[in-house]
């Protein structure tokens, strides 16, 4: 990350992961468990033993109603921004490159807001579930490029997980920067 100008040579589009890339998520999982344990009734935990927890989560919209809002709040309360990545974003913006967020999770606008990042700086905000799958999905990565009208050979994916973000980039023939 130290030589960000060379990283952007020949690049016209930068596709960034959000969680763990734009902020340091160290300790977030533990804080999430502590914050959310109360929201899963014993009945739901019992259903886990019988394979019904996922059905309960979906039927009650727990993920959208409880999990994601809690995650957004905790990110705002204690996850520092990765200033080196934001410097790369600023340099890409200064150069007039296309910028996109391609996340494995929802609530993208809300997360950007609590991090003090303007969603308007990005040409596309999209999550893999909105595209019908999870990373690394070649079809999802291709759809991101299609929506941006971007060529793989001039696109740089930036992320914190090679097995997800890097695989997505390689699947479509794009460059990848692991932070």
Model-derived features with residue positions:
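Substrate-recognition "cap/lid" segment bordering the active-site pocket of phosphatases
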Residues: 102-156, 164
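Acidic, Mg2+-coordinating phosphoryl-transfer loop and its flanking beta/alpha structural elements
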Residues: 154-179
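Short glycine/proline-centered loop/turn elements that form peptide/ligand docking sites
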Residues: 22, 86-87, 137-141, 161-168
């Amino acid at each position: 990350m130290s030589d960000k100008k060379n990283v952007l040579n020949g690049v016209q589009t930068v596709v960034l992961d959000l969680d763990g890339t734009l902020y340091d998520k160290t300790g977030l999982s533990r804080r999430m468990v502590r914050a959310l344990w109360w929201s899963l009734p014993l009945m739901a935990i019992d259903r886990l033993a019988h394979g019904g927890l996922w059905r309960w989560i979906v039927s009650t919209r727990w993920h959208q109603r409880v999990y994601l809002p809690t995650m957004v709040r905790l990110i705002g309360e204690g996850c520092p921004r990765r200033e080196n990545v934001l410097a790369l974003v600023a340099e890409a913006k200064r150069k007039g490159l296309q910028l996109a967020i391609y996340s494995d999770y929802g609530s993208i606008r809300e997360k950007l807001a609590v991090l003090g990042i303007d969603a308007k700086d990005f040409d596309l905000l999209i999550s893999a579930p909105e595209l019908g799958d999870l990373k690394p999905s070649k079809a999802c990565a291709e759809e991101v490029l299609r929506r941006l009208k971007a060529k793989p050979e001039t696109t740089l994916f930036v992320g914190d997980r090679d097995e997800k973000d890097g695989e997505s980039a390689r699947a479509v023939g794009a460059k990848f920067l692991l932070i």
